[in-house]
A protein has these predicted regions:
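Non-catalytic, conserved peripheral segments adjacent to functional cores
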Residues: 2-100, 106-109, 114-116, 122-153
Length: 153
């Protein structure tokens, strides 16, 4: 039997994704219809293009990233004590296929490929709220956390 695997780029195109403020592209897939209430959870599909970074940011909910297709990402996490950790996200031997971000941590990612992007699902608990989103610029990150300078190289 001939199995053809779908690429991250094909999934991005199939889902009519839009640019995200932190970089990458996304489409919201699950949400509660009543905007007056914050749903217990939310789901987006997210795509990171080759050589792209997603900017450091913090959200007011827990988040899980589940790898779907493409190439691994390098994920940088700064915990509530200001300690930086890094992990590889993907499905190769040295990667994690699911990554958990605790509410309030600062995190970012960058593509490890020049040729292929990464497609993933992001699950938030509770649902993501724009009011709980904080984006950090390069200069601010390097000033507060000098070890992040190499992220931008």
């Amino acid at each position: 039997m001939n199995k053809e695997y779908i690429t991250a780029e094909m999934l991005m195109e199939r889902n009519n994704m839009q640019p995200h403020v932190e970089n990458g592209s996304f489409v919201e897939k699950h949400y509660k219809a009543d905007p007056a209430e914050r749903a217990a959870s939310g789901l987006i599909y997210y795509y990171v293009a080759p050589e792209e970074i997603t900017e450091f940011h913090r959200i007011d909910c827990d988040e899980y990233w589940c790898f779907t297709a493409g190439t691994p990402l390098s994920i940088w996490i700064i915990d509530e004590n200001g300690v930086l950790s890094r992990t590889k996200f993907g499905i190769t031997e040295d990667c994690e296929p699911v990554v958990y971000f605790k509410k309030g941590v600062i995190f970012a990612s960058k593509s490890l490929s020049k040729d292929e992007g990464t497609f993933l699902s992001c699950i938030t608990v509770p649902r993501f709220s724009p009011a709980g989103f904080e984006l950090f610029g390069r200069e601010e990150m390097i000033s507060k956390f000098p070890e992040t300078e190499s992220f931008y190289e």
